[in-house]
Amino acid sequence: MFRIHCNKCFRRRNVEPTLIFHMTQCQHVLCASCLSESSTDKKCPLCKRDLRAIPIDKNLPPNVAQYFEDPLRFQQLYRKISKFQADQRASDNLGFYRQMQEHEKNESRLKGFCKMEAQFNQQIQKEKERIAELRAYIKYHEEEGLKEWPHATGVEKPWSNQARGLRPRTPSVTTSDNTQSDEHMTTFCLDSDIDCLEEDEPRRYVKKTFNGNIKDFHI
């Protein structure tokens, strides 16, 4: 801390406590005597600028009083301020880094969901095609059943592929393409058509085939 003194005549405040000192707007210190001498031309005797001054006492404005305080106090204060602001910047950077990590995770999850959606859409399209095949297959056999139904009471008429038209492919009952052949359909039989032998004898299965004649159909 410096000793308050007049920058023109160098009189010190600690030597003359009753002497009033002033601080000018140009940051010079003048005693009352030197200030009164310069009041005629209203110029600072040191820098010749316009003279405006206030007395140095306890009523100094805060922005002027801090010029007369120990700078070490400001050094410690600014050190705390600097540390506080550095911590806040580090916290902000950490928050931004975590947000970027979360954004990358969400982006990865979104890509996975998009792949799943594409797979589901592809599977749905396959199922729609399979349903269309099933409907065509059912419609074909329903129409053939209506055509052949009058022959149940009348004279049998041999089936003709030309009259029946092109038979649709037997659709798979599962999502995998396990198409049943015509040979498999000709050996199709119901559980009630299985003849069982006596319990003490080995069981033999006799499969009855359905050749298309309505008279031969039994349950």
Swiss-Prot record:
Additional notes on this entry: Nenya, narya and vilya contain a RING-type zinc finger domain and are named after the Three Rings of Power given by the elves of Eregion in J.R.R. Tolkien's books.
Gene name as annotated: nenya
Stored InterPro entries: Zip3/RNF212-like, Znf_RING, Znf_RING/FYVE/PHD, Znf_RING_CS
Function (record text): Required for the formation of DNA double-strand breaks together with narya and vilya during the meiotic recombination process. Plays a redundant role with narya in chromosome segregation during female meiosis.
The entry's keywords: Chromosome partition, Meiosis, Metal-binding, Zinc, Zinc-finger
Species assigned in the record: Drosophila melanogaster
Region span, Disordered: 161-181
Protein's recorded name: RING finger protein nenya
Subunit note: May interact with itself, with narya and vilya through its RING-type zinc finger.
GO molecular function term, any single one: zinc ion binding
Keyword Zinc-finger: yes
CC per GO annotation: chromosome; synaptonemal complex
ZnF (RING-type) residues: 6-48
One of the protein's GO biological processes: reciprocal meiotic recombination
